[in-house]
UniProtKB/Swiss-Prot annotation:
It comes from the Bacteria. Keywords: Cytoplasm, Metal-binding, NAD, Transferase, Zinc. The keyword Metal-binding applies. Nicotinamide binds at F35, I107, D108. GO terms for molecular function: histone deacetylase activity, NAD-dependent; NAD+ binding; zinc ion binding. Binds 1 zinc ion per subunit. This is NAD-dependent protein deacetylase. The gene is cobB. The active site is at H123 (proton acceptor). It is found in: Cytoplasm. Its main location: cytoplasm. NAD(+) binds at A24, T28, F35, R36, Q105, I107, D108, H123, T193, S194, N217, I235.
């Protein structure tokens, strides 16, 4: 393991345009579980068990807003979570001028809380919420303190989290920014993701000019064979050792 850590240190030292692509594994170390590991919910009224994927779909939000928000508040918002060693190390790399962008599948805002500035949030953020009718902004606290379905204080419309639900497209501007950053990178570090969620996982295909592809994940991924360095360990532990 020490050999791999030293190799990663060497790669970082010789890189000037690093991009980090991260998934749920980055945030699990801050106590935020991957929502896909959540149990499905049984709806007694309908006599149906919904999967986590169904519960955070656009059609479920439209048809059963109350049930959507019950699940959303219980399983997707973690207001007491703090950045871990991975978030802090990445913010330091940006401060050093090495890291140029973070592309994340997470919606918790922990990268920004750690100090990272150039973050492309592919799936949005729980910290931003907007009225579906008049587009008034509301913060995470408003959602958590709302009883039942959050309603706009100005017009009474439903306040929807600015997160990309299943059946919804990703934001074009975010995608363009992420592709631009990845395609220009000299080193791409992929961490805390098994690369199975599309279209997000497909973005790594835009990395074809760089010198170093690094994969840090507890389990193996489909991209391991293409990588110059694979470390099967905790992302926080690895990055914490690299940026000490």
């Amino acid at each position: 393991m020490d050999d791999k850590i030293n190799k990663l240190k060497e790669i970082i030292k010789n890189s000037n345009n690093i991009v980090f692509f991260g998934g749920a594994g980055v945030s699990t170390e801050s106590g935020i579980p991957d929502f896909r590991s959540a149990n499905g919910l049984f709806n007694e009224k309908l006599n149906i068990t919904f999967t986590p994927e169904q519960l955070v779909s656009h059609s479920f939000f439209e048809r059963y807003p109350e049930e959507f928000f019950n699940f959303y508040k219980a399983k997707l918002i973690y207001p007491n979570s703090k950045p871990n060693d991975a978030h802090i190390a990445l913010a330091k790399l940006e401060e050093m001028g090495k890291l140029k962008a973070i592309v994340t599948q997470n919606i918790d805002g922990l990268h920004q809380m750690a100090g990272s500035k150039n973050v492309f949030e592919l799936h949005g953020s729980v910290l931003r919420n907007y009225c579906v009718d008049c587009h008034t902004f509301y913060d995470e606290k408003f959602i958590l303190e709302s009883k039942g379905v959050p309603k706009c204080t100005k017009c009474g419309g439903i306040v929807k989290p600015d997160v990309v639900l299943y059946e919804e497209p990703l934001d074009d501007n975010v995608i363009r920014g992420a592709i631009d950053a990845i395609s220009k990178a000299d080193t791409l570090i992929i961490g805390g993701t098994s690369l199975v969620v599309y279209p997000a996982a497909g973005l790594i295909n835009y990395y074809f000019r760089g010198k170093n592809l690094v994969l840090i994940n507890k389990s193996s991924t489909q991209a391991d064979s293409k990588a110059d360095l694979v470390i099967n360990d905790s992302i926080g532990k690895v990055l914490g050792k690299v940026i000490d």
